[in-house]
């Protein structure tokens, strides 16, 4: 009944999920295509009841926000082959105070970084590694799984492969990721290769290495990743009472996440769980903005750029692999692409921290785009907004400390909270508090 296969995004070519393939014969990206007619054998209300019951279940698959929607992910994967670290079901933070400050109807922040390895990449990696685990058990010769990474993908790959007992290899741009991101794959036992290049250089090499099918590619050009990441849409819909907000803002680098967000929303529309489309807004750092540039030229073509250094290091990407899917997402969802400066992303992240968040710089990019678009009235006062927060702020402690210590190059912090050093006397403390309270 439920069935999925790889399908070209630009043609009719299909391939079984058991085949190791990342593009069609003409070089176009693939997607996982489902038999959606089988989904309609249940009514929307029946799906709501089923998914609601799984939310309170302690069955291993149901403890995962991804696998609790398994009929829409990899429906034919045996339960015993699933490799899960209880990913998903991340909190939806009500940022109403910030919504009032910028005069919009409502604002929530989806905290995808509240996950096992601290980023949304867990959602896609559970699907990819589970399928690899299944293929190996079926006798496919796979020696290792490999990825190029700006930090978060490598952390997710290494953890899930460690859980499954599958060797992993990560290619990192030397000196360009945080200590927290670097230590994760090291700790989980990955083969860690630091290359004297940027992410795009690492991506080029890993594609050549994985041309040998015995080393499996784990980057988001592998459409299995998108199947896990699309469940962000399902979770949002369920958490908001089976509706989606008017606007969803998501940071964009390699653009797999926006592709996934659109695909998940397509699914919800196809099932009949929602009727109204949200607008999807992609936010890029000014220093790594090829998608923004293409958008401003009405998507005539993608012109790769040499990404400059940005505090939002995970999206420091100049040649995004998932560009074709992301372009279609923006067109289908009445979307906007915005860019923000280093100053804007830094201040936006720390402005949000003042209401109880602890934002990574990439979330700062999304928030900065929201603030800019609200000022332009591209987002109206009557609209509800959700920000997709892609990683946990604890992975970027240097960014947080540097902002408050005012040591970030080129940044003049608007919301810095300096430590006050005082003599160890009650009088000195009381005098200082009189000035501060």
Predicted regions: what is each one?
Residues 1-437:
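PLP-dependent amino-acid enzyme catalytic core
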């Amino acid at each position: 009944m439920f069935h999925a296969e790889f399908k070209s995004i630009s043609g009719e070519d299909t391939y079984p999920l058991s085949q190791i393939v990342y593009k069609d014969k003409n070089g176009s990206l693939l997607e996982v295509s489902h038999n959606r007619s089988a989904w309609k054998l249940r009514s929307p209300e029946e799906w709501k009841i089923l998914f609601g019951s799984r939310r309170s279940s302690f069955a291993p698959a149901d403890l995962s926000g991804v696998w609790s929607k398994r009929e829409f992910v990899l429906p034919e994967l045996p339960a015993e082959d699933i490799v899960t670290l209880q990913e998903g079901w991340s909190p939806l933070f009500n940022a109403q105070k910030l919504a009032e400050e910028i005069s919009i109807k409502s604002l929530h922040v989806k905290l995808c970084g509240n996950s096992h390895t601290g980023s949304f990449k867990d959602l896609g990696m559970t699907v990819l590694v589970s399928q690899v685990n299944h293929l190996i058990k079926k006798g496919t010769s796979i020696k290792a799984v490999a990825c190029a990474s700006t930090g978060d993908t490598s952390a997710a790959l290494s953890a899930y492969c460690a859980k499954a007992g599958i060797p992993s290899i990560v290619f990192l741009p030397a000196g360009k990721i945080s200590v927290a991101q670097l230590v994760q794959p090291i700790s989980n036992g990955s083969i860690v290769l630091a290359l004297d290049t940027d992410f795009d250089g690492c991506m080029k090499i890993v594609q050549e290495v994985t041309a040998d099918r015995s080393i499996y590619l784990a980057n988001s050009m592998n459409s299995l990743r998108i199947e896990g990441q699309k469940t962000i849409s399902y979770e949002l819909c369920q958490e908001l009472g089976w509706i989606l907000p008017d606007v969803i803002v998501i940071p964009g680098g390699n653009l797999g996440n926006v592709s996934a967000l659109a695909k998940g929303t397509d699914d919800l529309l196809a099932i009949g769980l929602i009727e109204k489309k949200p607008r999807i807004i992609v936010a890029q750092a000014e220093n790594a903005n090829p998608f923004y540039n293409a958008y401003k030229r009405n998507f005539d073509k993608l012109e790769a750029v040499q990404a400059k250094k940005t505090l939002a290091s995970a999206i420091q990407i100049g040649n995004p692999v998932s560009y074709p899917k992301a372009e279609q997402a923006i067109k289908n969802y009445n979307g906007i692409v915005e860019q923000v400066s280093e100053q804007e992303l830094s201040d936006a992240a720390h402005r949000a921290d003042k209401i109880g968040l602890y934002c990574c710089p990439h979330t700062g990019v999304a928030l900065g785009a929201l603030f800019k678009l609200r000022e332009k009235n591209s987002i109206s006062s009557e609209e509800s907004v959700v920000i997709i927060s892609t990683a946990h702020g604890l992975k970027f402690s240097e960014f947080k400390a540097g902002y408050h210590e005012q040591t970030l190059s080129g940044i003049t912090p608007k919301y810095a909270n300096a430590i006050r050093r005082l003599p160890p006397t009650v009088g000195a403390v009381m005098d200082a508090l009189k000035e501060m309270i």
